[in-house]
Amino acid sequence: MSNVDAAEIAKFSELAHRWWDPNSEFKPLHEINPLRLRWVDTRAPLAGKKVLDVGCGGGILAEAMAGVGATVSGIDLSEKALKVARLHLYESGKSVDYELVSAEDYAAAHPGEFDVVTCMEMLEHVPDPASVVAACARLVKPGGWVFFSTLNRNAKSYLLAVVGAEYILKLLPRGTHDYAKFIKPAELARMAREAGLETEELTGMTYNPLTKVYRLEADTDVNYLMATRREA
């Protein structure tokens, strides 16, 4: 439980009731969710698989993965977000097992249980991302997949993800991101390697403010996704 930023938990808990409003502060998550789901599902087909979403928040990705036939669990440290996630299951009719627990504590209790682990838009919000990466590696079965997404750290990502997204375009509330916590792909790849995960693929995610469209492409300067696999 030590690897937690209380201010980050409080920030997202305050907005918890708005998780499932597609026009709220979480609009970007709703818009990128189909891209994230398709990207994961094409690399590690989810139907019939046991999947864990680390830092699941209100359950946007967790529910989507359940919707394509996965048996999904979601963990988070925001009690309010999890309450919203559980309530939304009544509306969607989907089945997800949510639990209030850290990745590290959950890994100690459930080592090697999951075919696929996702950890999306979460690493940049914790004090020790390497600890979360290591926990994800412990949670996945040998040969299983772990998928991450986070923000690169450079001048361009600061201008677009912080200044642009939070202050100019107002896609996100001010203070959503702390630039100092952004993670370069090479840094994340090293964390993964040290945890026993081999990086299989790196993909960028871009946003066009004119067309208001998100795309997956080669540009990893700002947002990126990383597919890793535990050694069999």
UniProtKB/Swiss-Prot annotation:
The keyword Transferase applies. Pathway: Cofactor biosynthesis; ubiquinone biosynthesis. One of its GO terms (biological process) is methylation. It is an enzyme of class 2 (transferase). InterPro entries: SAM-dependent_MTases_sf, UbiG_MeTrfase. It catalyses: a 3-demethylubiquinol + S-adenosyl-L-methionine = a ubiquinol + S-adenosyl-L-homocysteine + H(+); a 3-(all-trans-polyprenyl)benzene-1,2-diol + S-adenosyl-L-methionine = a 2-methoxy-6-(all-trans-polyprenyl)phenol + S-adenosyl-L-homocysteine + H(+). Disulfide bonds: none annotated. Keywords: Methyltransferase, S-adenosyl-L-methionine, Transferase, Ubiquinone biosynthesis. S-adenosyl-L-methionine binds at R36, G55, D76, M120. It comes from the Bacteria. GO terms for molecular function: 2-polyprenyl-6-hydroxyphenol methylase activity; 3-demethylubiquinol 3-O-methyltransferase activity; polyprenyldihydroxybenzoate methyltransferase activity. Its EC number is 2.1.1.222, 2.1.1.64. Transmembrane segments: none annotated. NCBIfam families: UbiG (TIGR01983). O-methyltransferase that catalyzes the 2 O-methylation steps in the ubiquinone biosynthetic pathway. Belongs to the methyltransferase superfamily. UbiG/COQ3 family. This is Ubiquinone biosynthesis O-methyltransferase. The gene is ubiG.
